[in-house]
């Protein structure tokens, strides 16, 4: 089989797509996000967490990223659980007026989220015809995971070619996104007067902002850690490409770190627990392949603001740690967005990255 029978450019482009915008929902009708050939001039992005929601209005034109507005809203209690909408009515009540007052109604919208229900696996498959790819991928996933793949939307990112015993194999990063979550967000965006355009996952959002703002200054293997209230999302980049992702669910809520900062013992217990989980993740990554070594850690998200966290992680992990406090190659317009640039950029990286559309 000749390599030119496979459109590798198409496979690589899939790596620049979000978790599929064209989704067939397991219901009576098909629910579709807008097609990629109609990229809007500007978008509204929503990074919906269990404690806070970040809303960003911006545009990505000719490799220029412009942020017009940044808004923070509190997520109603128990309305988002593990990336799923559990109380649509409370969430709608919290957001619909904010969207309207900010003049965002009717704009194309992108949601960036994460969930332990999203399956992310690296698979190695033999060289096959392009038309056979999804069938082979589904077969490989089904071998290891006892799930009904008909309930998932499958997306794959081509990573590299490897040769074993003169046989060519492909390494793919495969993401399986529950279709019911896609439908929930699609319906929700319509109900808050936004035009559903795309559904993203947080590690893909950070991958895009990494490529746009950090890649030129990064060498070796770098771990980005989104330190949220209920979970930490780890994205590891190796030689400029995303190589590994993992969600760490917090055994104890990090809300106490933000609302009851004086509770020293609770804070220490939480940070100790998180650090141990990070050690396990990094050890697993290092053991995956010879030469996998984390050389630098960048932290962001709400919990990254905990006093002395950077120094503590450095001492425990023996790796250089930096808190993200600015990003390159981004223009901020408007009072609120300029304030975010100066004081809160670490809270908005996922939402800003989701503005980037290819």
Q: Would you name each region that the model predicts?
A:
Residues 1-358:
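Hydrophobic/aromatic-enriched cytosolic interaction surfaces used to assemble or bind macromolecules
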């Amino acid at each position: 089989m000749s390599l030119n029978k496979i459109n590798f450019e198409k496979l690589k482009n899939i790596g620049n797509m979000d978790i599929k915008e064209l989704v067939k929902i397991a219901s009576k009708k098909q629910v579709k996000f807008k097609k990629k050939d109609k990229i809007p001039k500007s978008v509204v992005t929503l990074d919906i967490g269990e404690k806070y929601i970040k809303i960003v209005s911006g545009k990505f034109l000719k490799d220029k990223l412009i942020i017009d507005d940044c808004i923070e809203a509190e997520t109603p209690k128990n309305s988002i659980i593990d990336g799923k909408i559990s109380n649509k009515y409370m969430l709608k009540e919290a957001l619909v007026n904010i969207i309207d007052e900010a003049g965002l109604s009717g704009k194309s919208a992108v949601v960036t989220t994460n969930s332990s229900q999203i399956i992310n696996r690296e698979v190695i498959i033999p060289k096959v015809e392009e038309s056979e790819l999804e069938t082979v991928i589904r077969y490989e996933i089904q071998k290891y995971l006892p799930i009904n793949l008909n309930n998932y939307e499958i997306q794959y990112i081509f990573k590299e070619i490897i040769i074993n015993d003169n046989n060519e194999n492909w390494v793919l990063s495969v993401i399986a996104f529950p279709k019911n979550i896609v439908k929930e967000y699609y319906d929700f965006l319509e109900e808050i007067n936004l035009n559903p355009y795309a559904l993203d996952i947080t590690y893909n959002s950070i991958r895009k902002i990494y490529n746009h703002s950090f890649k030129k200054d990064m060498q070796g293997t770098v771990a980005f850690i989104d330190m949220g209230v209920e979970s930490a999302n780890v994205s590891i980049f190796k030689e400029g490409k995303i190589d590994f992702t993992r969600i760490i669910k917090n055994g104890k809520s990090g809300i106490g770190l933000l609302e009851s900062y004086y509770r020293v013992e609770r804070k220490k217990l939480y940070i100790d627990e998180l650090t141990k989980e990070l050690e396990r993740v990094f050890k697993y990554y290092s053991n995956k392949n010879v030469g996998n070594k984390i050389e630098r850690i960048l932290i962001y998200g709400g919990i990254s603001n905990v006093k002395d966290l950077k120094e503590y992680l450095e001492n425990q992990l023996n790796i250089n740690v930096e808190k993200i406090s600015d990003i390159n190659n981004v223009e901020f317009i408007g009072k609120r967005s300029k304030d975010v640039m100066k004081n809160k950029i670490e809270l908005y990286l996922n939402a800003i990255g989701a503005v980037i559309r290819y």
